[in-house]
């Protein structure tokens, strides 16, 4: 038991990352602590997006700090997609070689009339399945099509095979929020260290 505790502590003490990205369209910095308590410090300049990222942090228990300055005078596309890129990169960096983690996670999240499920495999083979439809083009000032762009960027840069499916729902706010919460809960399981793995990848191949 002492050996397992040592392995667990040695892995979790370093599961943090800071990543910055600067282009002509956006300037973004992200800090993550995978073994946090879900603290969120989010400023993207997009109110509803901030709300969604807050949910992502709180329900994954990942401490998440995001600062984004983007060309929102044009539209929100660059800010949302690029934020997904940097959060994904930060999670992947914090995971290191992806060894010793549970790897898989899934969650069903109900939100009033809405039910959404998410499944994730932290396998370094990025893929997104997105089966989500909205009844309106916007939630607040944010285009609903941008949610797919965010999750595509998150999965692509986080080494995630991610499936998100809204099973049913009517309220667009509930549909969007349940997608973030379901993904958060799936990640919460997948990033959990399993000391029985001894720091090795959860793979029959011995590597990811």
Swiss-Prot record:
InterPro entries: IGPD_sf, ImidazoleglycerolP_deHydtase, ImidazoleglycerP_deHydtase_CS, Ribosomal_Su5_D2-typ_SF
Pathway assigned to this chain's UniProt record: Amino-acid biosynthesis; L-histidine biosynthesis; L-histidine from 5-phospho-alpha-D-ribose 1-diphosphate: step 6/9
Molecular function GO terms recorded: imidazoleglycerol-phosphate dehydratase activity
Protein's GO biological process: L-histidine biosynthetic process
Disulfide bridge positions per record: none
Listed GO CC annotations: cytoplasm
Pfam families: IGPD
HAMAP family linked: HisB
Family: Belongs to the imidazoleglycerol-phosphate dehydratase family.
Protein name (database record): Imidazoleglycerol-phosphate dehydratase
Organism of provenance: Hyphomonas neptunium (strain ATCC 15444)
């Amino acid at each position: 038991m002492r050996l397992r505790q040592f392995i667990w502590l040695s892995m979790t003490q370093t599961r943090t990352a800071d990543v910055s990205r600067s282009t002509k369209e956006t300037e973004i910095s992200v800090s993550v602590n995978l073994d946090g308590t879900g603290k969120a410090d989010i400023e993207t300049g997009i109110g509803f997006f901030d709300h969604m990222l807050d949910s992502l942090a709180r329900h994954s228990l990942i401490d998440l700090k995001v600062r984004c300055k983007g060309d929102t005078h044009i539209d929100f596309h660059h800010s949302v997609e690029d934020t997904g890129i940097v959060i994904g990169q930060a999670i992947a960096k914090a995971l290191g070689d992806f060894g010793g983690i549970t790897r898989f996670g899934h969650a069903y999240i109900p939100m009033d009339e809405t039910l959404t499920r998410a499944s994730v495999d932290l396998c370094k083979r990025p893929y997104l399945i997105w089966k989500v439809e909205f009844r309106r083009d916007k939630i607040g000032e944010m285009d609903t099509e941008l949610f797919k762009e965010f999750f595509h960027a998150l999965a692509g840069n986080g080494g995630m095979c991610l499936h998100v499916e809204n099973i049913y729902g009517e309220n667009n706010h509930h549909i969007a929020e349940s997608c973030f919460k379901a993904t958060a809960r799936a990640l919460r399981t997948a990033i959990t260290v399993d000391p029985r793995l001894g720091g090795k990848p959860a793979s029959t191949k011995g590597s990811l």
